[in-house]
Amino acid sequence: MDELLLLSGNDIPFPEARVTIHQPRLREIAFIGEEAFFTGCEFLNFSKDMLQEKDKINLIHQTNFEILMSIVNDKSPLGINTKNAIFMLLTLLFPDYEIKFQEDGIFLLNKNEFVTLNKMNFDEFQKILVQMFCLNKKKDNEQDYNPGGDRAKMIAEKLKRGRQRAAAAKGEENQKIAVFSRYISILAVGETKDINSFMDYTVYQLYDEFDRFELKQNSDVYLQARLAGAQDLEEVDNWMKDIHP
């Protein structure tokens, strides 16, 4: 996807469904909260490729979308909570549409038209989400799985246990989910900006600025140390390098 389109914050074309996807601002995400946002992202981005080969056997005849629908159609409390998180995220992505869950698809309705998320276009939808929300950057402790349905629950529990071990090794297992608020706080102080100005950023814009700021800080510290006569310093990356490979 074009980096300028992502960085501009404009809506993103989703031609496979004949609709555009809104890039929500952080102030919009704040309405649903970071936990619901990351939970929704986690499940909308679910892929069998995350699993080990032995865990894929029972799912070989199901698409990623069919697995997702088995979760949102589950009536257990955990399934309902997950469905609510997905619903809230979808309302941010498609603000002009009413969201309806059916057994075979997710329908987006307004007075003029309706479009459908289904197994035919869901893979392309996931690709857009991954780039728009930089989902390949997420850390182990950013969100929890709340599965519904026996098969989906089995998948999610395996993933959750693996992540819990990684988080426990870092002493982060019980940390709250506050990724965006932390990044905003750091940038507001580090760049001497009004904290409210970041609320109009998209997720992509926030990550872009934070990564660039971090590279610039490292570069400045390195140059200051060199000028002060420090020896045997480890080289740092050029702060102007491409950060979206």
Regions found by a protein language model. Give the residues of each.
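Long, intrinsically disordered, low-complexity Ser/Thr/Pro-rich regulatory/activation regions
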Residues: R226-P245
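Long amphipathic alpha-helical segments with strong coiled-coil/leucine-zipper propensity
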Residues: N81-R163
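Ordered, small/hydrophobic-rich secondary-structure cores
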Residues: L51-G105
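An amphipathic, hydrophobic-aromatic interaction surface with interspersed Lys/Arg
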Residues: M1-E66, D74, V130-Y222
